Structures are given as structure tokens and as C-alpha cells.
């Protein structure tokens, strides 16, 4: 009796685990990081002393270009704001210095310092995954280990997005055109960045980085002390457009080769750019996509609008619970029996952490709203 070849029992070869997208954290590097002790409170209060002759509400020094009442700086209002600022300076020079003159034998009136507080309340975040004994006992992959990695990456993403939600809502706003998000119809320009630099400098914002000197290597360039700029990866192509950004220097041409982050992409004038796919745009939030077809859209009626975050030192901060700066990982392996799972058929992997963030000084950072060119 002839025998046929037996069919394969499995007929599949176990390949390697494929790489996957890993969330990127970039915003943390520019923030003031504070660890709160346990068993104290869920609230942190940051305090600054308002400088002499400064606005007690905003902390802006007199003579500095003021913000508009709704928190948005309209580019069209620039001349009027500068004129107002110049008038304030004239008044300060005439009265401020004179007010500090002393009269012989007369005790001057004592001034008082004014505090400005920024309150941050910790929030608790977490995630939980489950798996079964069948997956653990019979599956060819280490499901528990894979879930641990997934949890760590998810927590990192949550932490980045929580911070991003705060900084992109900063009130010192610039628009590449128009005066609102839904009017955006063009890409980022060097002139808008220069306006931001001027505003930050007038508000005494300190730059985040020092000057980098060129090296002996061919083609390297010096890099100025700079504000940090965080943007979506879709913006990179516009930055490399030499027509709009003459003098843009990619990281490969840094003389001393000291990128601030693995996602740093380049610099121009007093800005260094760090790009991340997590810094998502307002999808379809801009002008009509059918009219402005040269710009990225998510398939809706409007073009995508990208917040570009520009920051000096101590503009925003993050708070974590001390001892839980990363996260508290929890693992319940399969086989753990209790009244809710008497046969120990389920396992769990999860994590929780406490964190929050806040803008500490609105005048030391800015958000530019822009479109991104299609390729």
C-alpha cells in the first residue's frame, strides 16, 4: 500500500519579531524638572519675584513689547506694539531713574517685592494589559516580556503628549499668516522666526545653548547660542529649503558635533531644531485644502496646522513624584490564583505614574502656527 507524504503539522516558520515604531520624547530636555517628595501634597507651587518696574500680572518688564489682550501676538500689530514699548521706555527713563534719587537727610519710601505663583497639580496616569495562560504556555513568543516593553513605550508617549498639550497652548502665539489657526495657508519662514527671537530677547528670555565652535573638519560651521525649536518631522523639508532658509546648517555640519538630542536636525541663526513625529498638527485645522493644495492635509477640508514650540530657559516645567520618576511597573503572571481568577488563567502587565507640567513663563517661549509643504 503506497503511503503519501504527510502534511506539515504547522507549515510555518517562526520569523524574528519585527521592529516597531517607538515613541520619541524630546520636550523634556528643555523643561525645568522637579521631583516632589512622597506624602506631601499633590500640588507644587512655583514662585518668581516680579522685577522692579514690571507688570505684576504678566511679569513683563516695562518697555518690553506687550502681549495682546487675548494672548495672541498678531504680526500686523508689531509696529504699534513697538511704538507703545518705546513710549514706556521713555516714561521709565524719565520717572524711574528720577524716582530713585535720594534727598539729603530724607529716608526714601520703602518698596515691597511682589511674588507671582504658578500652581501645578499632579495627575495619575496608567495603563493595563492582560494575557491568558494559553498565550503564555503554548505561544511561541514571550508575551509577558513583550507587554513590559509595550507598557514602557506607552507611558513615555503619554508623558510626552501631556507636556505637548501644555506647551502648544502657550499664549505667546505667532501665525505665519493671518491671525488665527484656521487662516494658516503657508509654510514656516525665517522672518517669522526672527520676530520670535526679537520678542523673546525683549522679554529677557535666556537662550538654551552656548556657542559651538567649528572644527578642523572640512565643511563644518560655527553654531550660535540658540533657542530650542520643537517641531513635527513634516517641517524638516521646509527648513532644508535654501530659498526660504539660507544658511540652514544640518547637524552633520556642526563643528563640534554636539547634538542636544538624537532627533536634532539642524540650526539657523539663533535657533536649533529638534523634530518628533509625536508633535502632531491640528489636522485639517487651516485654510481650505482645495485652494492651498501645496500643503499637507489629513484628507479633510483644511490643511494641517503645525504648532512649532520655541523656548528659552525655564519657560516650562514638569513635576514627577520622587521615586516614581519613570513609572511603577506591575506584573501579575499567569498562575496567580485568587477568587476572581481561581484557575490562574489570566496575567496582567501595567504601570502607573504621577506627573504634570505647566508653562512657567509665557514670555520666555512662543508657539508658531504654520503649514507644511507637500513633497
Regions found by a protein language model. Give the residues of each.
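N-terminal "assembly arms/tails" that initiate or stabilize quaternary assembly
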Residues: 1-120, 365, 370
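Short acidic, glycine/tyrosine-flanked loop/strand segments centered on an H-E-D-like triad
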Residues: 110-139, 318-324, 330
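Structured, hydrophobic secondary-structure cores that serve as assembly/anchoring elements
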Residues: 123-125, 129-139, 143, 211-241
Amino acid at each position: 500500500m503506497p503511503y503519501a507524504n504527510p502534511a506539515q503539522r504547522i507549515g510555518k516558520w517562526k520569523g524574528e519579531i519585527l521592529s516597531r515604531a517607538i515613541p520619541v520624547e524630546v520636550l523634556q530636555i528643555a523643561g525645568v524638572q522637579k521631583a516632589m517628595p512622597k506624602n506631601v501634597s499633590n500640588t507644587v507651587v512655583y514662585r518668581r519675584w516680579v522685577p522692579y518696574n514690571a507688570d505684576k500680572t504678566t511679569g513683563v518688564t516695562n518697555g518690553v513689547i506687550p502681549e495682546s489682550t487675548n494672548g495672541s501676538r498678531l504680526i500686523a500689530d508689531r509696529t504699534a506694539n513697538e511704538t507703545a514699548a518705546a513710549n514706556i521706555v521713555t516714561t521709565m527713563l524719565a520717572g524711574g531713574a528720577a524716582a530713585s534719587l535720594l534727598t539729603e537727610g530724607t529716608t526714601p519710601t520703602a518698596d515691597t517685592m511682589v511674588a507671582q505663583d504658578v500652581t501645578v497639580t499632579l495627575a495619575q496616569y496608567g495603563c493595563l494589559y492582560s494575557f491568558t495562560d494559553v498565550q503564555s504556555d503554548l505561544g511561541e513568543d514571550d508575551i509577558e516580556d513583550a507587554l513590559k516593553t509595550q507598557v514602557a513605550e506607552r507611558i513615555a508617549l503619554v508623558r510626552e503628549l501631556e507636556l505637548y498639550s501644555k506647551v502648544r497652548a502657550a499664549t505667546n502665539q505667532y501665525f505665519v499668516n493671518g491671525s488665527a489657526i484656521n487662516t494658516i495657508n503657508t509654510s514656516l519662514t525665517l522672518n517669522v522666526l526672527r520676530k520670535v527671537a526679537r520678542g523673546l530677547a525683549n522679554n529677557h528670555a535666556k537662550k538654551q545653548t552656548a556657542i559651538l565652535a567649528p572644527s578642523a573638519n572640512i565643511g563644518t560651521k560655527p553654531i550660535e547660542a540658540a533657542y530650542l525649536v520643537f517641531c513635527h518631522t513634516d517641517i524638516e523639508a521646509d527648513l532644508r529649503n535654501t530659498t526660504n532658509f539660507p544658511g540652514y546648517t544640518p547637524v552633520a555640519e556642526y563643528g563640534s558635533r554636539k547634538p542636544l538630542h538624537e532627533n536634532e536636525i539642524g540650526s539657523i541663526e539663533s535657533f536649533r531644531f529638534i523634530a518628533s513625529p509625536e508633535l502632531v498638527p491640528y489636522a485639517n485645522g487651516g485654510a481650505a485644502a482645495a485652494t492651498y493644495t501645496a500643503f499637507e492635509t489629513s484628507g479633510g477640508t483644511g490643511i494641517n496646522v503645525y504648532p512649532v514650540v520655541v523656548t528659552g530657559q525655564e519657560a516650562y516645567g514638569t513635576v514627577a513624584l520622587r521615586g516614581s520618576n519613570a513609572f511603577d511597573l506591575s506584573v501579575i503572571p499567569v498562575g496567580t490564583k485568587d477568587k476572581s481568577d481561581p484557575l490562574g488563567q489570566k496575567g496582567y502587565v501595567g504601570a502607573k505614574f504621577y506627573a504634570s507640567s505647566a508653562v512657567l513663563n509665557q514670555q520666555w517661549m512662543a508657539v508658531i502656527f504654520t503649514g507644511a509643504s507637500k513633497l
